[in-house]
């Protein structure tokens, strides 16, 4: 079973400037909880026991959020309001942190988790993407596919043509309903995307991915892309793509973030 997950949270959040100069996108409010709280809840519900958050020097708010605040607890106790904390408890899960000195891409961030993974398969969950499913959590769907096929699996969502340039897009061969054997993957295609199936911020990797990441050189923008590592592994390994059930919200896109807030207000309850 997959028990470890990496959350890469060290980037500058340039798609959400200028607010991300002071507030990490992972801490954007969704109701009374920040984005990353929902993500950690999903991991907990999927059976994850240990999380490694890859952060940078400007992401201390994330660390503070998951830490205890004795001063706040004492204040609430004095006012007989401790129930306010119990209404939205921090998930009971082990969280570790590592500092990424420079924002050098998703692949670089994942490489900081090699020791944490310890030679075992592991999950990667991007904090840009919230996926709410009425049934099985998104990562749980991937873990189920990995358990069956014992190979790396990428979470996919069918995506509108005009939005495909934001994501890695696969070319795949159908294996069963909702599951594809990946033949190619293109990072943020500007034209002629190979399909409408885009990476949805959920991955299960075998430890071999670290060898591929170490062999890569940074791209023209100075970043190491996990898409390139996946593409490089396709000759020697089978990588699957799993269509995920549930509603996806890309927090980096203002239209998605606003839609999430609207959907919450419309239903008058959290989307879970």
Swiss-Prot record:
Q: Which reaction does it catalyse?
A: alpha-D-glucose 1-phosphate + UTP + H(+) = UDP-alpha-D-glucose + diphosphate
**Which enzyme class?**
transferase
Q: In its keyword annotation, does this UniProt entry include Membrane? A: no
Q: Can you provide one Gene Ontology molecular function annotated for this UniProt record? A: UTP:glucose-1-phosphate uridylyltransferase activity
Assigned EC number: 2.7.7.9
Could you give a single Gene Ontology term from the biological process aspect?
UDP-alpha-D-glucose metabolic process
Q: Which UniProt keywords apply?
A: Nucleotidyltransferase, Transferase
**Top-level division of the source organism's lineage:** Bacteria
Q: Which Pfam families match?
A: NTP_transferase (PF00483)
Q: Which InterPro entries match?
A: GalU_uridylyltTrfase_bac/arc (IPR005771), NTP_transferase_dom (IPR005835), Nucleotide-diphossugar_trans (IPR029044)
Quote the SUPFAM superfamilies the UniProt record gives.
Nucleotide-diphospho-sugar transferases (SSF53448)
Q: Which family does it belong to?
A: Belongs to the UDPGP type 2 family.
Which protein, by its recorded name, is this? Answer: Putative UTP--glucose-1-phosphate uridylyltransferase
List the gene name: ytdA
């Amino acid at each position: 079973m997959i028990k470890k997950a990496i959350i890469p949270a060290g980037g500058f959040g340039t798609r959400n400037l200028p607010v991300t100069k002071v507030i990490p996108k992972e801490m954007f409010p969704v109701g009374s909880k920040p984005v990353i709280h929902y993500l950690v809840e999903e991991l907990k519900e999927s059976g994850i026991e240990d999380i490694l958050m890859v952060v940078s020097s400007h992401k201390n708010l994330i660390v503070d959020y998951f830490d205890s605040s004795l001063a706040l607890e004492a204040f609430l106790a004095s006012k007989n309001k401790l129930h306010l904390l119990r209404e939205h408890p921090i998930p009971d899960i082990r969280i570790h942190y590592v500092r990424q000195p420079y924002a050098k891409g998703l692949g670089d961030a994942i490489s900081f988790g090699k020791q944490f993974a310890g030679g075992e398969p592991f999950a990667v969950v991007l904090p840009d993407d919230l996926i709410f499913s009425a049934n099985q959590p998104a990562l749980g769907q991937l873990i189920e596919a990995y358990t069956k096929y014992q190979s790396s699996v990428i979470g996919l969502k069918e995506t509108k043509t005009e939005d495909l340039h934001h994501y890695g897009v696969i070319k795949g061969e159908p294996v069963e309903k909702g599951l594809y054997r990946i033949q190619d993957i293109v990072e943020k295609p500007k034209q002629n995307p190979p399909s409408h199936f885009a990476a949805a911020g959920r991955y299960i990797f075998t430890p071999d991915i670290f060898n591929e990441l170490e062999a890569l050189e940074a791209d023209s923008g100075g970043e190491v892309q996990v898409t390139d590592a996946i593409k490089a592994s396709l000759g020697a390994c089978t990588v699957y793509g799993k269509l995920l059930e549930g509603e996806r919200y890309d927090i980096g896109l203002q239209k998605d973030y606003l839609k999430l807030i609207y959907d919450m207000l419309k239903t008058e309850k959290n989307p879970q």
